[in-house]
């Protein structure tokens, strides 16, 4: 079993708790926050002369799912594979962790008023996490190549 970097494991767990905390916000509060973000993005795009009609509450919510799990993927990979070994004994626990967290997240939402846990969000979350894992390995490879040069 790979050695886990404890400092990064704590940061990773804090990120998971932040995600779960967001899921505990009732639908009205969550929807209000999403609408505020949507209006800010639309206002910015409009001010620079770009099309903004495509930015909807739905798009903002799904991008938030993807982004928070991309960050979690980066952090988890750093915690589970601090040395950049990319071996099965490192990747398997990372993958299980990154599947378990969104599954729990969507289950939490089943019990929060105005929220719904849906499998499509788990899939979006897992895609975000996978993107984070890939980005972390790409960044590590680039940094190692730069040091070697």
Task: For every predicted segment, state its role.
Residues 1-74:
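"…centered on the first transmembrane helix and the immediately adjacent amphipathic helix/loop
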Residues 68-83, 127-143:
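Membrane-interfacial alpha-helical segments at the cytosolic side of multi-pass membrane proteins
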Residues 4-10, 85-92, 115-119:
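Membrane-helix interface segments
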Residues 14-19, 90-110:
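Small-polar-interrupted transmembrane alpha-helices in polytopic inner-membrane proteins
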Residues 12, 73, 94, 98-102, ...:
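Small-residue faces within membrane-embedded alpha-helices
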Residues 76-84, 89-98:
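Post-HEXXH active-site segment of zinc metalloproteases
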Residues 145-149:
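Short, charged juxtamembrane terminal tails flanking transmembrane helices
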Residues 102-126:
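Interfacial helix-loop-helix junctions of multi-pass membrane proteins
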């Amino acid at each position: 079993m790979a050695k886990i970097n404890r400092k990064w494991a704590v940061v990773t767990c804090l990120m998971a708790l932040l995600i779960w905390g967001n899921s505990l916000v009732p639908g009205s509060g969550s929807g209000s926050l999403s609408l505020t973000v949507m209006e800010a993005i639309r206002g910015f795009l409009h001010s620079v002369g770009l099309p903004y009609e495509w930015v909807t509450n739905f798009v903002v919510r799904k991008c938030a799912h993807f982004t928070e799990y991309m960050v979690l993927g980066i952090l988890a990979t750093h915690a589970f594979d601090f040395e950049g070994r990319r071996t099965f004994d490192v990747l398997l626990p990372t993958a299980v962790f990154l599947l378990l967290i969104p599954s729990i997240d969507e289950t939490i939402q089943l019990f929060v008023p105005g929220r719904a846990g849906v499998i499509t969000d788990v899939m979006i979350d897992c895609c975000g996490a996978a993107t984070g894992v890939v980005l972390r390995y790409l960044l590590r490879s680039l940094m190692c190549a730069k040091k070697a040069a």
